[in-house]
Amino acid sequence: MTAVVLDGVATASAVKSELAVRIRALREQGLVPGLGTLLVGDDPGSRAYVAGKHRDCAEVGIESIRVDLPADATEADVRLAIERLNSDPAVTGYIVQLPLPAGIDENAMLELIDPSKDADGLHPTNLGRLVLGVQGELTSPLPCTPAGIVEMLQRYEVPIAGQHVVVVGRGLTVGRPLGLLLTRKGLDATVTLTHSRTRDLEQEVRRADIVVAAVGVAHLIKPEWVKPGAAVLDVGITRVVDPETGKARLTGDVDPAVAEVAGHLSPNPRGVGPMTRAMLLANVVQAAERDARLAAELRG
């Protein structure tokens, strides 16, 4: 058996094409969606990540609002920048790029974000709505990586309802919110959330119809851990040194040999990562459409 590849690049491209149509409709109404980013410092990885987001915006027709602060910015500086993004009518949604410099309370800064402009879907208010809203349409933004995982599974027609999903990793950006999303009525998966203290992790993974590896341990998930035909999504990233070249490279949580056992496999890179970026754009478009509906209601 060779796994069907869950191609995140192709799937994200399809999502962005659909978003571009919706954005054109918004622009025809005089509403221009805008994504803001707040970057503090000169971390090369963060700069590259933010630049990628703005390239995505240009591709689909979303305006970019970029706020960069120096590495020696104070918490007061960051607070002021967030307040300005909250009040800027050109900003439909925005993100605060993490990590922030030492000495700045990240949680306190993130809680300052206007929940209606939370493009990452990770504000406590929006996560709380995900907890409470077990059925019906969610109008608040969803965490981007979990939403991207679900979108990709659905587009490849991988069954979710009634399936046993094992999530390896309990982080705020993937593991915990993914469990909440997959157990909503309408998706109806049964989710086991595992972590570093889970007893017999191998046995838990082997029971899964769908495995999501998001722990950041290189090649943790071995082929003998995976039930034949299971869908496996590789989310975690680890920087390792290539023994042949001596150069650092990025690798995922899933051993490449899993492709010979799994029914579906998302590669890493080119798997879930592009879908995360596409869902960020989707959150901005959804917020713009919400604003358009509110404006129409006010006009009567």
Curated annotation (Swiss-Prot):
GO CC term, one of those recorded: cytosol
Superkingdom, taxonomy of origin: Bacteria
Keyword set, alphabetical order: Amino-acid biosynthesis, Histidine biosynthesis, Hydrolase, Methionine biosynthesis, Multifunctional enzyme, NADP, One-carbon metabolism, Oxidoreductase, Purine biosynthesis
InterPro entries (alphabetical): Aminoacid_DH-like_N_sf, NAD(P)-bd_dom_sf, THF_DH/CycHdrlase, THF_DH/CycHdrlase_cat_dom, THF_DH/CycHdrlase_NAD-bd_dom
Claim: Magnesium is one of the keywords in the record: no
A biological-process GO annotation: L-histidine biosynthetic process
Any one GO molecular function term: methylenetetrahydrofolate dehydrogenase (NADP+) activity
Record's function text: Catalyzes the oxidation of 5,10-methylenetetrahydrofolate to 5,10-methenyltetrahydrofolate and then the hydrolysis of 5,10-methenyltetrahydrofolate to 10-formyltetrahydrofolate.
Quaternary structure annotation from Swiss-Prot or TrEMBL: Homodimer.
HAMAP family registered for this protein in UniProt: THF_DHG_CYH
Annotated protein name in UniProt: Bifunctional protein FolD
